[in-house]
């Protein structure tokens, strides 16, 4: 049992997240014509994390959601050569724009950094009634039987999924597992078919291993 506890601790330590700029990013910022704006945004981001560290859960979720949602939305096709590019939190905050995946990703890693357990956070791919394209949001769940709280770049409020009537979740995933969603609940474990490129594994490698 003692060995198991040590292994779990080491696993969690290896995959702990810390927002820390590397030399390449520092050089980019220093040479950017938007240096002042970038530094101001990053300073506010660090101040926000410090301020909310001891807040109760719902206030933490709401502050992170609100802070990120102030960043300018932009579709991949207008910002990147690759369609459906998933930016790291540092890319998102330095560039100052992104699409729904980028908001969800940065909220996820920010919440990890201030102590929210990763097993309680899930990325959810949803359909939005009246819209043709899929959308991504971040779910917070106390457990898999509870109603998710939704962090969405299209909404300033963090509210239960049952109150977001236009959202129809298809599946949800995190670093641990992935599930199909039926009738607003987790149902069965599924293996996601990412196609030619597993964007999720690639993102995790860039964040944890390459410090991008």
Give the ranges of each region predicted by the language model.
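Sec-dependent N-terminal signal peptides
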Residues: 3-12
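Structural motif marking the loop-to-transmembrane transition
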Residues: 1-2, 57
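A structural boundary/capping signal
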Residues: 16-212
């Amino acid at each position: 049992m003692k060995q198991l506890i040590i292994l779990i601790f080491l696993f969690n330590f290896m995959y702990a997240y810390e927002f820390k700029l590397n030399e390449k990013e520092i050089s980019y910022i220093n040479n950017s014509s938007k240096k002042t704006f970038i530094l101001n945004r990053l300073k506010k981001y660090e101040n926000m994390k410090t301020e909310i560290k001891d807040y109760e859960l719902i206030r933490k979720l709401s502050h992170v959601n609100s802070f990120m949602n102030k960043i300018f939305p932009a579709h991949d096709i207008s910002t990147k050569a690759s369609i459906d590019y998933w930016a790291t939190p540092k890319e998102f905050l330095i560039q100052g724009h992104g699409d729904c995946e980028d908001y969800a990703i940065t909220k996820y890693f920010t919440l990890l950094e201030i102590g929210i357990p990763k097993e309680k956070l899930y990325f959810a791919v949803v359909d939005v009634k009246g819209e043709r394209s899929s959308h991504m949001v971040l779910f917070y769940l106390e457990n898999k039987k509870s109603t998710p709280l939704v962090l969405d770049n299209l909404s300033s409020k963090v509210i239960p999924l049952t109150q977001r009537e236009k959202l129809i979740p298809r599946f949800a995933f995190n670093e641990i597992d992935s599930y199909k969603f039926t009738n607003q609940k987790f149902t069965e474990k599924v293996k996601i078919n990412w196609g030619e490129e597993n964007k999720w594994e690639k993102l995790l490698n860039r964040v944890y291993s390459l410090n991008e």
